[in-house]
Design a protein with these regions (language model features):
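Short amphipathic alpha-helical segments
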Residues: 66-68, 139-142, 164-165
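A substrate-engagement module of RecA-like helicase motors
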Residues: 3, 28, 50-127, 132-135
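Conserved pre-motif I regulatory segment
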Residues: 1-31
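SF2 helicase catalytic motif II
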Residues: 132-133, 145-167
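Alpha-helical elements of the RecA-like P-loop NTPase motor core of helicases
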Residues: 40-43, 63, 136, 161
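Short basic/glycine-enriched coil/helix segment immediately N-terminal to the Walker B
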Residues: 22, 114-125, 138-150
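Hydrophobic residues on the short alpha-helix immediately C-terminal to a glycine-rich phosphate/catalytic loop
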Residues: 16, 45-48, 65
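Motif I (Walker A/P-loop) of helicase-class P-loop NTPases
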Residues: 36-48
Length: 167
């Protein structure tokens, strides 16, 4: 946390540490009001794991994590956020994606901006992304993003509507 946790953060962390030591818990949900410091709690918890994903569904939260903890993580964004070096337009229309053609910029020795951030995020101890991107990557069984020891999903109460929107 960088500084001593506030009372409610310390209480939440105490319960989380207890639950993590107890093998009966696969999922832990922290529900607390805005401003309590859930992001700081999440960052403290992930520090105890070898590697983790941090998923947040909103740009506001992504910006907050990037601003407050950017040096501790690598962010990965979807292709539409990057220009394609093989043709005009964004990388979501790239031949290597749309037509599954081989592209020299999809290799680690000369990556385009999309692949550069993707390769860095794959190797990072902590990767920041959004549920939509990670769901699509894992569903497509794309190489690179392997299972991690921990997944922190900020705003997890919105996951049901997120998955319903995919149908």
């Amino acid at each position: 946390m960088g500084q001593s946790p506030r009372k409610y953060q310390a209480e939440a962390l105490s319960v989380i540490w207890w639950a993590l030591k107890n093998d009966d818990f696969d999922n832990i949900v922290v529900q607390a009001p805005t401003g309590i410091g859930k992001s700081a709690i999440a960052m403290t918890v992930q520090d105890r794991f070898r590697n983790a994903y941090l998923l947040t569904p909103t740009l506001g939260l992504t910006d907050q994590y990037r601003r407050d903890y950017g040096s501790k993580m690598k962010e990965v964004q979807g292709r539409r956020n990057f220009a394609c070096w093989a043709r005009s337009g964004t990388a979501d229309g790239a031949p290597c994606y749309k037509k599954k053609k081989k592209c020299r910029h999809a290799e680690e020795d000369d990556p385009c901006p999309y692949y550069e951030q993707k390769f860095a995020a794959e190797k990072a101890r902590l990767t920041l992304s959004n549920p939509s991107y990670m769901f699509r990557v894992t569903q497509s069984q794309a190489a690179g993003f392997e299972q991690r020891d921990l997944a922190v999903i900020d705003e997890a109460h919105n996951l049901e509507s997120f998955f319903l929107d995919l149908l």
